[in-house]
Regions:
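Sec/Tat-exported extracytoplasmic proteins
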Residues: 19, 23-26, 47-54, 93, ...
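Pan-zinc metallopeptidase signature
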Residues: 169-230
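Active-site recognition of the HExxH zinc-binding catalytic motif
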Residues: 102-121, 125-126
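Active-site/pore-lining binding-face segments in mid-to-C-terminal subdomains
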Residues: 122-177
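Alpha-helical transmembrane signal-anchor/signal-peptide segments
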Residues: 1-8
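Solvent-exposed, acidic/flexible segments
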Residues: 93-101, 113-117, 134-138, 189
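Auxiliary, metal-adjacent structural segments of Zn-dependent hydrolase domains
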Residues: 21-93, 97
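Cysteine-nucleophile amide-bond enzymes
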Residues: 13, 17
């Protein structure tokens, strides 16, 4: 997917507006993050709603659960995974709550057959933002803004920093919380696990390795150019 710096900045600024608006909706609605069981049920509901618009997102036989290795995964950098032997979507429910809705829809995308990480990110986004759940909207837009902002930084650090400054204060607080969480769970093993996983992705037709996740940015640019919305 081809895009230039102006496309990246355009996408970043749209996501900036989306994540700020979603956070305001969460605050004004006094939304409270649900229990794990309710979270997974609501993730399934998000696919049910998205299916009305995108029939290919039909999600049958829900099977999502908390990862038994959540605490261990914190130190290895895992937020969730798809178990190909059981067909279950596993969500690390020890990570910050605001990440978990999008993690759930991402892992459920793998269950639908979207094996590549950029595809699972995009399908998870479609499910999350087409739901009527502001917690899912915020979770997806938060993660996607971070992806886009990081990409912009490589080409225009001034534009990247300017966007960060324009975030809602509560969104900034969540970024601080996420950074602190990552700092608290640094380990000697994480760089090695990241390297191994990156090579695993390359062996499975994802040549960008660990950076495959970021390729959702190009898909979002293409989607916006075709449909005029994110």
């Amino acid at each position: 997917l081809q895009y230039d710096t102006s496309d990246l900045i355009m996408l970043q600024n749209i996501l900036l507006q989306k994540v700020n608006a979603a956070k305001l909706s969460v605050i004004r609605g006094h939304e409270v993050y649900p229990s794990n069981g309710d979270l997974f049920k609501r993730a399934g509901n998000s696919y049910d709603m998205a299916e009305r618009k995108y029939p290919f997102l039909r999600y049958k036989n829900p099977s999502v659960k908390s990862s038994f290795y959540g605490w261990f995964g914190d130190y290895l950098g895992f937020t969730g995974y798809y178990n190909p032997f059981t067909g279950e979507a596993q969500v690390n429910t020890t990570v910050p709550k605001f990440l978990q809705p999008y993690i759930a829809t991402h892992e459920m995308a793998h269950q639908l057959g979207y094996a590549k990480e950029n595809e699972a990110n995009f399908v998870g986004y479609l499910a999350a933002v087409n739901s009527n759940d502001s917690l899912f909207h915020y979770s997806a837009y938060f993660d996607l803004f971070i992806y886009a902002n990081r990409e912009v930084y490589y080409f225009d650090s001034v534009a990247s920093k300017k966007a960060l400054e324009q975030l809602n204060p509560e969104v900034k607080n969540d970024i601080v919380e996420l950074k602190q969480f990552d700092l608290d769970h640094q380990s000697f093993f994480e760089p090695w696990i990241t390297w191994l996983y990156g090579n695993f992705l390359k062996l499975n037709q994802q040549p960008q390795g660990i950076h495959s996740y970021n390729e959702v940015v190009g898909m979002l640019v293409a989607y916006y150019k075709k449909y005029g919305k994110i």
